[in-house]
């Protein structure tokens, strides 16, 4: 940047450098996607093609930044886990948040055009995302965070599945369906689906019930201070070349995490 007498204005800029040696989770969320889904006539209660667009945009982000170890997505939301030793953008909060939000926004549009060539995106209703970042100090916090998001996915999907079944198959208005579901718990909704419509919720697709987990999979070598510089470089190279695999399974129990210890290094 050229020197000038006006450069003093940079003194007003402030950077928030996030705590070192802590886990970072960046969560991106669609802005106004309720209206967006109505505008472009998403299938109800779930649009598998729209989920594919979101999942592919998230994969593109992971491919761009090897420090992202895993991601969890549901609907128009995605959470990205950055490894504890991550130094991406010097851990500057504003840089991370703005980059993730803009990257997902443009990649969502790119993937949309591939998946929905028959649905032209209009200027009046563009897909945009905001982002936030949270610092977590322990493995327990990370696991509890992703458990929270997956439980939320289940609760929302069961409600939406029941709501739209009442509307589409039961002939109710949206207000009538809301009133019928008012005060119900999960067992009530399951019983309603099965007794009134012959739908066993357990047979619904796992992607809808459990969301999408993206994982950087590679031959694991434990990182640590005892590794030589060459060994550390080899591990970093493996991480960059790692395949990004998609799963729809339980991440609340121990199995998923025990099989992938590198995620929480």
UniProtKB/Swiss-Prot annotation:
GO MF terms here are:
GTP binding; magnesium ion binding; tRNA guanylyltransferase activity
What cofactors are annotated for this protein? Mg(2+)
Q: Where are the transmembrane segments?
A: none
The UniProt annotation places Mg(2+) 1 binding at 29-30, 76
Kindly state what the record says about how the cofactor is bound. Binds 2 magnesium ions per subunit.
Q: Where does GTP bind?
A: 29-34, 75-76
Q: Which E.C. number(s) belong to this protein?
A: 2.7.7.79
A UniProt-annotated Pfam family = Thg1
Query: Which catalysed reactions does the entry list for this protein?
Result: a 5'-end ribonucleotide-tRNA(His) + GTP + ATP + H2O = a 5'-end phospho-guanosine-ribonucleotide-tRNA(His) + AMP + 2 diphosphate + H(+)
Q: What highest taxon heads this organism's lineage?
A: Eukaryota
Q: Where does Mg(2+) 2 bind?
A: 29, 76
Keyword vocabulary terms for this entry? GTP-binding, Magnesium, Metal-binding, Nucleotide-binding, Nucleotidyltransferase, Transferase, tRNA processing
Q: Name one GO biological process term.
A: tRNA modification
Main function = Adds a GMP to the 5'-end of tRNA(His) after transcription and RNase P cleavage.
**Which family is this protein grouped under?**
Belongs to the tRNA(His) guanylyltransferase family.
Q: What is this protein called?
A: tRNA(His) guanylyltransferase
Tell me the organism. Debaryomyces hansenii (strain ATCC 36239 / CBS 767 / BCRC 21394 / JCM 1990 / NBRC 0083 / IGC 2968)
Gene name tied to this protein:
THG1
């Amino acid at each position: 940047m050229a020197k000038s007498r006006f450069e003093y204005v940079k003194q007003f800029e402030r950077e928030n450098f996030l705590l070192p040696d802590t886990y970072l989770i960046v969560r991106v969320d669609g802005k106004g996607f309720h209206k967006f889904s109505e505008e472009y006539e998403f299938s109800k209660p779930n649009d598998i093609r729209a989920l594919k667009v979101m999942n592919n945009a998230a994969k593109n982000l992971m491919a761009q930044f090897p420090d992202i170890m895993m991601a969890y997505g549901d609907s128009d939301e995605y959470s990205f886990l950055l490894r504890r030793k991550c130094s991406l953008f010097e851990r500057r909060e504003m840089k991370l948040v703005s980059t993730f939000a803009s990257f997902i926004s443009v990649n969502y549009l790119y993937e949309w055009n591939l998946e929905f060539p028959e649905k032209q995106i209009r200027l009046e209703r563009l897909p945009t995302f905001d982002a936030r970042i949270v610092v977590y100090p322990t493995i327990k916090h990370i696991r509890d965070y992703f458990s929270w998001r997956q439980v939320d996915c289940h609760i929302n999907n069961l409600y939406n599945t029941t709501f739209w079944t009442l509307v589409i198959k039961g002939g109710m208005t949206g207000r009538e369906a809301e009133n019928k579901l008012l005060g119900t718990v999960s067992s009530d909704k399951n019983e309603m689906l099965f007794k009134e419509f012959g739908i066993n919720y357990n047979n619904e697709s796992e992607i809808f019930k459990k969301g999408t987990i993206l994982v950087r999979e590679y031959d694991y070598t434990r990182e640590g201070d005892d590794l030589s510089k060459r060994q550390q470089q080899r591990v970093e190279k493996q991480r960059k070349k790692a395949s990004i695999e998609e799963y729809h399974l339980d991440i609340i129990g121990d199995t998923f995490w025990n099989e992938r210890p590198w995620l929480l290094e």
